[in-house]
């Protein structure tokens, strides 16, 4: 934000600008954030007697990291190194964002707003396989959902790893990574590219030996992923990947940013089919999207009522009354973290626990910078 009056300086999705100019009073900054110009500096401030331009710059992000082309920023100067914080979820993040030595090609984002709290979408993608055969029944009825059918969601595992969690589908038995990826519609060239970047004991073992295909996931707090493979025509399925951010506007409204992702070196025909599959299912007009949002808006609306304040919702799926899990950890799951087969709300509880821990943590005691003056304040 501009150091003058706090206006947002950059409002474009992408570009190649060499400078950034605040639209309010035209203060201008170089691409490295340093202040380049102040209109009427002499007349308005008496030059450096009123405001020293030298050495002024936009506030830098305290912590920044890049993985697979994605930029992650923390505003906490005491945040641990990103890879340390990401932990075991790095394994699953690579499925969605590292499928080729050429990198991933993104389209978007689509942006729209929903009258729902941001945490509902985040926790849904983290582990709610239970809703699929019910909320998305209409999608099944028209034949959009190919194999595996939604009622087989209970055969997949729910995993928790580091600050993230996700869902999987169980693949037909006896396959390897190539047959598993062909089963969900991947082109042979795309499979070869993925094998070139995935170590044999990593994702190929999860898909091949364990027989699980990653589906939806969330990285705390508000970054989600979805991988699905609907029918595009005559029984032929096409896989797609979507990356999405749940950006809070307020407690009752969320801006959704949704990107389509595909291997950059994939054949043009595969990219076209994959994008078509994405648009059918997700994005502002996707059929899955519309089903989900109707639920989330209703939950947010009823949560405002007096009756909702009297109710402690039950989020104990997968637990006995004494708090022990109904099923143990899956014995031969090739991915890192904790994995349990069947329905449960283990992942939602994990995500909300991380959120509660973040709220309890005191904010860092940082000095306030006084721009243009020779002092900082606490």
Task: Show the residue positions of the predicted features.
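C-terminal catalytic domain of Rieske-type non-heme iron oxygenases
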Residues: 62-66, 70-378
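Rieske [2Fe-2S] iron-sulfur-binding domain
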Residues: 1-77, 81-91
């Amino acid at each position: 934000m501009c150091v003058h009056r706090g206006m947002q300086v950059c409002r474009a999705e992408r570009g190649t600008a060499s400078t950034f100019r605040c639209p309010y009073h035209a203060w201008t900054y170089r691409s490295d954030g340093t202040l380049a110009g102040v209109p009427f500096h002499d007349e308005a401030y008496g030059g450096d007697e009123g405001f020293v331009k030298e050495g002024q710059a936009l506030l830098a992000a305290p912590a920044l990291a890049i993985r697979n082309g994605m930029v992650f920023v923390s505003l906490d100067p005491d945040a641990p190194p990103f890879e340390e914080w990401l932990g075991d979820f790095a394994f699953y993040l690579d499925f969605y964002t590292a499928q080729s030595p050429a990198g991933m090609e993104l389209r978007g984002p689509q942006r729209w707003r929903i009258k729902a709290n941001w945490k509902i979408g985040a926790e849904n993608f983290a582990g709610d396989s239970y809703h699929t055969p019910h909320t998305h029944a209409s999608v099944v009825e028209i034949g959009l959902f190919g194999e595996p059918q939604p009622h087989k969601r209970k055969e997949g595992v729910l995993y928790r790893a580091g600050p993230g969690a996700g869902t999987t589908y169980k693949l037909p038995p006896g396959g390897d990574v190539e047959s598993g990826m062909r089963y969900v519609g991947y082109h042979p060239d795309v499979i070869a590219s993925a094998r070139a970047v995935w170590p044999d004991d990593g994702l190929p073992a999860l898909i091949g030996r364990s027989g699980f295909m990653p589906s939806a996931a969330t990285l705390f707090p508000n970054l989600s992923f979805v991988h699905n493979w609907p029918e595009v025509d005559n029984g032929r399925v096409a896989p797609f990947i979507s990356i999405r951010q749940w950006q809070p506007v307020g407690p009752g409204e969320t801006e959704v940013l949704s990107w389509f992702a595909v291997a950059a070196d994939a054949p043009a025909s595969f990219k076209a089919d994959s994008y078509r599959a994405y648009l059918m299912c997700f994005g502002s007009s996707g059929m899955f999207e519309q089903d989900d949002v109707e639920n989330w808006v209703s939950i947010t609306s009823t949560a405002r009522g007096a009756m909702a304040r009297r109710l402690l919702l039950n989020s104990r799926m997968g637990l006995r009354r004494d708090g022990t899990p109904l099923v143990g950890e899956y014995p031969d799951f090739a991915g890192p973290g904790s994995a349990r087969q069947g329905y449960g709300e283990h992942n939602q509880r994990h995500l909300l626990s991380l959120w509660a821990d973040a709220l309890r943590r005191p904010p860092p005691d940082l000095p306030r910078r006084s721009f243009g003056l020779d002092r900082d304040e606490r």
